[in-house]
Amino acid sequence: MAGSEDKRVVGTLHLLLLQATVLSLTAGNLSLVSAAWTQEKNHHQPAHLNSSSLQQVAEGTSISEMWQNDLRPLLIERYPGSPGSYSARQHIMQRIQRLQAEWVVEVDTFLSRTPYGYRSFSNIISTLNPEAKRHLVLACHYDSKYFPRWDSRVFVGATDSAVPCAMMLELARALDKKLHSLKDVSGSKPDLSLRLIFFDGEEAFHHWSPQDSLYGSRHLAQKMASSPHPPGSRGTNQLDGMDLLVLLDLIGAANPTFPNFFPKTTRWFNRLQAIEKELYELGLLKDHSLERKYFQNFGYGNIIQDDHIPFLRKGVPVLHLIASPFPEVWHTMDDNEENLHASTIDNLNKIIQVFVLEYLHL
């Protein structure tokens, strides 16, 4: 009997071990399947708009409407915690919430220590289809650098970064009908949508340092890293859902050049170059020549400290659209409306809008 009992125990143990192995393998396979979507960004291919569609984009965007309705209300002093910061935040949210595309707007407010004590910061996150697994993300900062008033003048940071904010608002307006169609998800379309982020507290209050800079982006990157995505997921978070972070900064002066900073996103930089060339050849860019292209192939630029850094360190692919060299008016009182170049901004609006439509297959 003893021998029979031993065999039964051994047989039972063998069965339990086999079941545990099967369950483990099944769970592992489910985990792999559930995480497979995070790799789709690596082989995502854009659509290519034809000449007629490119013409429609050029006709659909309006530099005068952007200037009057989006940009001018932002050309104010708006350092974190200031009355202007509140006004800028309300302006951005109101311009987005009036659109048909049904953006979901979230304000991420938090306190952080600064050289002047604790300050309140508020990031603005505007998302189409938050339930989508993947998002193309456009971002900029809406705060202006704090400078003491000098001879009754204030620093309004036109290129830094009122213009990028206005460009993103104009993109949302000009593409409103097409972006609204992202609601119509079908099996033939990728589970992909668009997110706009307006960071607070990019600028240092005193001297740039790891502690005194990038307040909003540091906070949001950490928050997204600890937020499961899709909701309830155990192995993936909101950063996994970021296909590509396109960060706009120091835009608005004449004749900017944008280097390619990151080998990992070279194919997307190349796409911007191709769109620029296509629009130019169709006569849809103003005051522009290919002898002085915006998107230049002169090697990988030195990494510039900006709001993409906290996300880059956590593995998010980045396309950094910052003028390099910086505009001559950078961090001076002359970074104002008078020194902006409307044709350049209009041209870049067209290029970026085409890029977004192609990425999202719209």
Curated annotation (Swiss-Prot):
The active site is at E202 (proton acceptor), D249 (proton acceptor). The keyword Signal applies. Zn(2+) binds at D160, E203, H331. Keywords: Acyltransferase, Disulfide bond, Glycoprotein, Metal-binding, Secreted, Signal, Transferase, Zinc. One of its GO terms (molecular function) is zinc ion binding. Its main location: secreted. It is found in: Secreted. Disulfide bonds join C140-C165. Its EC number is 2.3.2.5. It catalyses: N-terminal L-glutaminyl-[peptide] = N-terminal 5-oxo-L-prolyl-[peptide] + NH4(+). Gene3D superfamilies: Zn peptidases (3.40.630.10). One of its GO terms (biological process) is peptidyl-pyroglutamic acid biosynthetic process, using glutaminyl-peptide cyclotransferase. GO terms for cellular component: extracellular region. InterPro entries: M28_QC, Peptidase_M28, QC/QCL. It holds the Pfam family Peptidase_M28. Residues 1-35 form the signal peptide. It is an enzyme of class 2 (transferase). Glycans are attached at N29, N50. Belongs to the glutaminyl-peptide cyclotransferase family. Responsible for the biosynthesis of pyroglutamyl peptides. Has a bias against acidic and tryptophan residues adjacent to the N-terminal glutaminyl residue and a lack of importance of chain length after the second residue. PANTHER family: GLUTAMINYL-PEPTIDE CYCLOTRANSFERASE. This is Glutaminyl-peptide cyclotransferase. The lineage of its organism: Eukaryota, Metazoa, Chordata, Craniata, Vertebrata.
